[in-house]
Amino acid sequence: MHRHEVREHAEVRHLSHFNSLFTGWGSRVYDVVMVRLTRRLYQRVIADLAALRLVEGKVLDAGTGPGTLVRELARRLPGLQVYGIDLSEDMIGIARAHARREQLEERVQFESGDVGHLPYPDQSFDVVVSTISMHHWYELEQPLRELYRVLRPGGRLWIYDFRFVKAQTLEKAKALTPFAETTLKHRLVRTGRSPFALYRCFALQKTAQRDHQQD
């Protein structure tokens, strides 16, 4: 089997795995079960964002799922405009339904899309966060390029994922992107005693200077 055929086969398997977890019945189960298991992590993310003391600005949640974090941020940090994107149209449908029911439609925006091809202009966001999503990404280089592109100069990227996600994996991908000249910081985040209580947070910051064009 040629290399491109191996890659295509891997992409098909990855898409099949994604569809089984995050579409149809799977999306509804995720909305009920995983959101409860990760609630304390979301509280930690909100606290981290609050510590920045942003009076106003835009925040993107990449891999937002049913939009729980986006809605919580809108309630807790009313000066921010909060956006969420997810590859699953079913998840985005759930997120929008929750926002309507909670009367948050004017405070939040949800889009269906790929983190590797974000539908936002350059330098759109002050902060991009991603929770329990990166380990599902088929590859890391293109998503990192896109996340860099949509960050404003000085903007921050925070990726929270399970403890088993290693910094070396992200470092290797980072070296191939405009983030290459920035330092990857990472730390363990404890949110309780449950099996879903220990996470790893990866932090990158875009340079404050205006960037020259990079391919």
PLM features: what roles do these ranges have?
Residues Q103-G116:
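Conserved SAM-binding strand-loop segment of SAM-dependent methyltransferases
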Residues S88-D90:
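Conserved SAM/SAH-binding beta-strand->alpha-helix loop
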Residues M1-R28:
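N-terminal, positively charged/glycine-rich alpha-helical extensions of SAM-dependent methyltransferases
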